[in-house]
Curated annotation (Swiss-Prot):
One of its GO terms (cellular component) is mitochondrial inner membrane. CDD domains: cytochrome_b_C, Cytochrome_b_N. This is Cytochrome b. It comes from Chilomys instans (Colombian forest mouse). It is found in: Mitochondrion inner membrane.
Length: 380
C-alpha cells in the first residue's frame, strides 16, 4: 500500500497533498481554518445540490418551493438550515483565515495570497446571488439595491444594470440567471481552491514563529489530520447547534414574507457577514465613491505585500504593529455593528470614522509602525 500511494498517478497527488506533505512542526490551531473552509465548501455543495433538486427558479413559485422544501421534503428543513447557516460559518472561517494571514505575514506568499483574494471575492459573489434565491422581501430588495450600484459606473452603468437584470427591473429573468450563477460558482471556487493549494505547496506553509521551518518538518498525516479532525468536529458542533436550536438567528425576518416590488422593507441590511462592507459603502455620500470604497475594502488586501517593509515575518515579536492589528479587528467589528443599524445620526458618523480608520490603518499606519520597529530593533 505504501508503494501504491507513492506510485499511483492519482494517489500520488493525494499523498503529496494530505499524507506525506512536509509541514512545519509548530503551526497552531489558527492554521486549522484552511481545512475547515474545505469542509464548509463540501457541506455547501452537497446541501445545495439537494436543495436544487426541489427548488424552482421562477418568481411565482420560488418562495413557496423553499417553504415546500422545509415542510414536505424529508429532512428538507435540515438541509435548508444547514445551507443557510453553513454560509455564515463559511464566512466566519474565511475572515479568521484572512486575519491569520495578516497577523502571521502569510501574505508574503504572493501567489497563494492573491488567489485567496480572488477566492474571497468569488465566495462573496456566490453568497450574494444565493441570498436572492428564496425570493423573500430582503432577497428582492437586496438584489435591487446591490445590482443598482453598477449604475454608478460612468457611461455604461444603466445599460449594464438592465443587462444583468434581463429587463427593466429585478424579475423572473434575474432570478433564473442568479440561480444559474449560484449553481456554477461553487465549482469555480473548488477549482480556485486547488490552485490555491498548488501555490501553497510550492513554497510550503508559513508558521507562527515566522522563521524558515525546513530544518524541522513533520508529515501531515497523522499529526495534522488528527488536529484538523478535532477542528472539524468543533465546527460541526457549532453549526449543528445553530441549525437545530437557533436556525433563524442570523437571518432577516423580512425574508419570511414573499417579495413585494411595491412595498420596501423598513431597513435593507445584508447578511451578517457583509455588514462591514455595507457600512463602508454607506459611509460615502457619493454613489460611485461608495461603490469604489466597497470594492477597495477587499482589494486593499492585495497591497499588504507591497506596503510591508518589516524585516520580521509576522507580528508575533512586534508589539506596536500587534496593537494596531487588534485596533483594526475591533474597527471591523464596529463596522459590522454599524452596517446593521439604520442610516441616521450617530451611526452614519461612527461609520464614516470607522471606514476612514479601516483604510488609514492598512495604507498609512501599518507601514509607519513597520519602519519604527525596524529602527527600534536596528534592522536596517
Amino acid at each position: 500500500m505504501t508503494i501504491m500511494r507513492k506510485k499511483h498517478p492519482l494517489l500520488k497527488l493525494i499523498n503529496n497533498s494530505f499524507i506525506d506533505l512536509p509541514t512545519p512542526s509548530n503551526i497552531s490551531s489558527w492554521w486549522n481554518f484552511g481545512s475547515l473552509l474545505g469542509i464548509c465548501l463540501a457541506i455547501q455543495i452537497l446541501t445545495g445540490l439537494f436543495l436544487a433538486m426541489h427548488y424552482t427558479s421562477d418568481t411565482t413559485t420560488a418562495f413557496s418551493s423553499v417553504a415546500h422544501i422545509c415542510r414536505d421534503v424529508n429532512y428538507g428543513w435540515l438541509i435548508r438550515y444547514m445551507h443557510a447557516n453553513g454560509a455564515s460559518m463559511f464566512f466566519i472561517c474565511l475572515f479568521i483565515h484572512v486575519g491569520r494571514g495578516i497577523y502571521y505575514g502569510s501574505f508574503m506568499l504572493l501567489e497563494t495570497w492573491n488567489i485567496g483574494i480572488i477566492l474571497l471575492l468569488t465566495t462573496m459573489a456566490t453568497a450574494f446571488v444565493g441570498y436572492v434565491l428564496p425570493w423573500g422581501x430582503x432577497s428582492f430588495w437586496g438584489a435591487t439595491v446591490i445590482t443598482n450600484l453598477l449604475s454608478a459606473i460612468p457611461y455604461i452603468g444603466n445599460t449594464l444594470v438592465e443587462w444583468i437584470w434581463g429587463g427593466f427591473s429585478v424579475x423572473k429573468a434575474t432570478l433564473t440567471r442568479f440561480f444559474a450563477f449560484h449553481f456554477i460558482l461553487p465549482f469555480i471556487i473548488t477549482a480556485l481552491v486547488l490552485v490555491h493549494l498548488l501555490f501553497l505547496h510550492e513554497t510550503g506553509s508559513n508558521n507562527p514563529a515566522g522563521l524558515n521551518s525546513n530544518s524541522d518538518k513533520i508529515p501531515f498525516h497523522p499529526y495534522y489530520t488528527t488536529k484538523d479532525l478535532l477542528g472539524a468536529l468543533l465546527l460541526l458542533m457549532v453549526l449543528m447547534i445553530l441549525v437545530l436550536f437557533f436556525p433563524h438567528i442570523l437571518g432577516x425576518p423580512d425574508n419570511y414574507t414573499p417579495a413585494k416590488p411595491l412595498x420596501t422593507p423598513a431597513h435593507i441590511x445584508p447578511e451578517x457577514y457583509f455588514l462591514f462592507a455595507y457600512a463602508i459603502l454607506r459611509s460615502v455620500p457619493n454613489k460611485l465613491g461608495g461603490v469604489l470604497a466597497l470594492i477597495l475594502s477587499i482589494l486593499i488586501l492585495a497591497t499588504l505585500p507591497i506596503l510591508n517593509s518589516s524585516k520580521q515575518h509576522g507580528l508575533i515579536y512586534r508589539p506596536i504593529t500587534q496593537t494596531l492589528y487588534w485596533i483594526f479587528i475591533t474597527n471591523i467589528l464596529v463596522l459590522t455593528w454599524i452596517g446593521g443599524q439604520p442610516a441616521e445620526y450617530p451611526f452614519t458618523t461612527i461609520g464614516q470614522v470607522s471606514s476612514i480608520l479601516y483604510f488609514t490603518i492598512i495604507i498609512i499606519l501599518m507601514p509607519i509602525t513597520n519602519t519604527v520597529e525596524n529602527n527600534i530593533l536596528k534592522l536596517h
